[in-house]
């Protein structure tokens, strides 16, 4: 097919005339004539050429025509009336000659450019996003803090239109929304009215956990803020006192609100008056016997579940109001049918139900403390606390402990254990003999009975040392609320110590008892080699740090082991060393055998009570004598004259040494008191404090 000459167009006289596209006709012609019509019509910028090409693929030809077809937008005035009849006849004859079908003059449709590919779109979007980010960064650099705050508020504040949209959505689904609210309210009421149910227990755990987390968060924030104040500055002391008091108030409120195991933890914190600031010990001391008490209907429910009848079935008189409320139970005064006055200890009805949740909360709190203060790592305490409390929640176990302790101390007239009434006792109810007396730390009440606090402290120390060093069956929770003082029934001018609450005891084997006796005796005598030997025998490798924890003084630098006071230099060295070696202390406590932890607890409580009584006795000398007595009691069992003679020799030498130390410190204290009276030494308060340091 020959190329048509463009001279045909010159015959058209109109300047703006454009030949209308033959696109459809050409496509049909090519489809009908695969071999004859070998031309391809191309239009470009008001020019069209017929190219001679071999067309073997119809689809390719169609695509080529679609791609090359183009009409310039500058020529939009192609009208059918602008074409002369002669021109129409010419093109129609041309169409017939080359089988181009009918010729129609229609208004041309504009062709659309090929849309960009997906990759190109992604690249364009990425470029736009990068440009937007760069613009935002440039704008944010120019913005002030007020502008940023204003932008945040604009994003967070709900506009009126958004509020209307929320109301509209609520109006559409108001039935479902109201039903959900009513269901939630009903679930809360059901949980409150039925605390023993599954939902009630879960709701109680969640609420108690929330209170504990809230309290812990506030305390950690307070101490974090305090840490930014220089310790040597004048304002640090004032801020620290305020921080201690606020934290103690928060803990007290948490313990009173949650009750149960939280009060138990608060009691232990209150006993650490030789370690913690006075704000803690003074604030939390009310938890020892002034915990919140429960309503009488809870007491009746426990009686009905455990014994089968109400209290009035077993007692002729039963006080509805408790005389004391402790961490795990409250005590009521009652009179049996036989006329005996008894104390009825009733466990809180929800204590066992909340036990697992409180232990879980305890674990979380220790984890948070470890995260906020990395030097503290006491997560291992949770499992030990759980094992101890499981035994303490069983009052039948407490009754067994009380009867065994009474048998061990039967030869000691200065100690008394109340008698247990088994018919009126169960796992959650314990009925014992009622004792009239005062708390051991109530100095005024002790003096009003005509007794001496020095004698009271000495009797108490001797009783506890007898349990530790001789019987190896130890009351490990002897805080002031569990120890009463009364006039001796046979000797009214002498005190008698009454031990209460025997739920937490620890029994030690004979090997441990002998090793601990040797350890304490050599601690007092400052025999380093033997202290190291018996510390390792007890399972403690770091014997120096262990000795410091027992004596609460720098053992390595102590010149005399019997001093009941501690110098300011020793105290400062002890505290600074404890702070620097806090991680070592944590590691030691973590690796220490668990039975030693309870001994340390007992030791701290003895120190605490001695301090509250004014440190009238030297507890080191008392404990050293009973340690030697415990060793002698073992040697007397063995048949051997040489062993007996050697033990007597050791006892005499120890007694001579103890008497010498006691006389030395007696004269030192007398001289100091005379200097104070003569006003030769002015800082009287400082001297007295040094004499009472660490009991």
Curated annotation (Swiss-Prot):
Molecular function as annotated in GO: ATP binding; protein serine/threonine kinase activity
Annotated coiled-coil segments of the chain: 118-150
Biased composition (Low complexity): 120-139
Any one GO biological process: altruistic, chimeric sorocarp development
Parts of the chain that traverse the membrane: 177-193
Membrane topology: Single-pass membrane protein
Binding site residues for ATP: 323-331, 345
Keyword list, A-Z: ATP-binding, Coiled coil, Kinase, Membrane, Nucleotide-binding, Serine/threonine-protein kinase, Transferase, Transmembrane, Transmembrane helix
Origin: domain of life: Eukaryota
Top EC class for this record: transferase
Residue ranges of the region described as Disordered: 105-149
Active site: 477 (proton acceptor)
Cellular location(s): Membrane
SUPFAM superfamilies: Protein kinase-like (PK-like)
Keyword Transmembrane attached: yes
EC number(s) given by UniProt: 2.7.11.-
Compositionally biased region (Polar residues): 105-119
Domain Protein kinase: 317-695
Major localization listed first in the record, in broad terms: membrane
KW DNA-binding (keyword) present: no
Any Pfam family the entry gives: ABC1
Name of this chain's protein: Probable serine/threonine-protein kinase abkD
Organism, as annotated: Dictyostelium discoideum (Social amoeba)
